[in-house]
């Protein structure tokens, strides 16, 4: 099931310049999700990171992983209209390859555990078949107040 940017924006609250998932390529609710982020030189982070040699910040790769996981949570629950997804922990984040404008980040997230409103994930970012980043993280789903 492919999910385009318009539908992604129906499922998560992030918007430009902080929406870091362009398309979902595959989703298996309650299990895993794969999506992409096309990295372009026009993104605001590249004005300062780094002007002479733009490099995607590692923290934004982790954010892309978390946003994709939030889409998985939303699709698994059927809706998050009355819920909010908050990142609680980031563990074992590793950055193994430079990501730069022109690259396509393939992001994959797997649900490792889900108990009540706490969800644990493992995620990777690959570029041209090479692991660029990997991380484990935990998110909490809360009712909107």
UniProtKB/Swiss-Prot annotation:
Q: Give the keywords, sorted.
A: Cytoplasm, Lipid A biosynthesis, Lipid biosynthesis, Lipid metabolism, Lyase
Question: What is the name of this protein?
Answer: 3-hydroxyacyl-[acyl-carrier-protein] dehydratase FabZ
| Gene Ontology biological process terms from the UniProt entry | fatty acid biosynthetic process; lipid A biosynthetic process
Return the EC number: 4.2.1.59
What organism, scientifically named, is this protein from?
Answer: Rickettsia africae (strain ESF-5)
What HAMAP family does its record include? FabZ (MF_00406)
Provide a GO CC annotation, any one: membrane
The record's listing under SUPFAM superfamilies reads: Thioesterase/thiol ester dehydrase-isomerase (SSF54637)
Family assignment from sequence similarity: Belongs to the thioester dehydratase family. FabZ subfamily.
The gene it comes from is fabZ
Q: Which domain of life is it from?
A: Bacteria
Lineage, uppermost ranks: Bacteria, Pseudomonadati, Pseudomonadota, Alphaproteobacteria, Rickettsiales
């Amino acid at each position: 099931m492919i999910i385009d940017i318009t539908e992604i924006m129906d499922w998560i609250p992030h918007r430009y310049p902080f929406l870091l998932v362009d398309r979902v390529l595959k989703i298996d609710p309650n299990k895993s999700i794969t999506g992409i982020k096309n990295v372009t030189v026009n993104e605001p982070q590249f004005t300062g990171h780094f002007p002479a040699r733009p490099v995607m910040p590692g923290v934004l790769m982790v954010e892309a992983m978390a946003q994709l996981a939030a889409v998985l949570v939303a699709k698994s629950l059927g809706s998050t209209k009355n819920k909010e997804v908050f990142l609680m922990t980031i563990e074992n984040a590793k950055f193994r390859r430079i990501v730069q404008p022109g690259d396509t980040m393939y992001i994959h997230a797997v649900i490792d555990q889900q108990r009540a409103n706490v969800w644990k994930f493992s995620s990777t970012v690959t570029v041209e078949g090479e692991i660029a980043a990997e991380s484990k993280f935990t998110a909490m789903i809360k009712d909107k107040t």
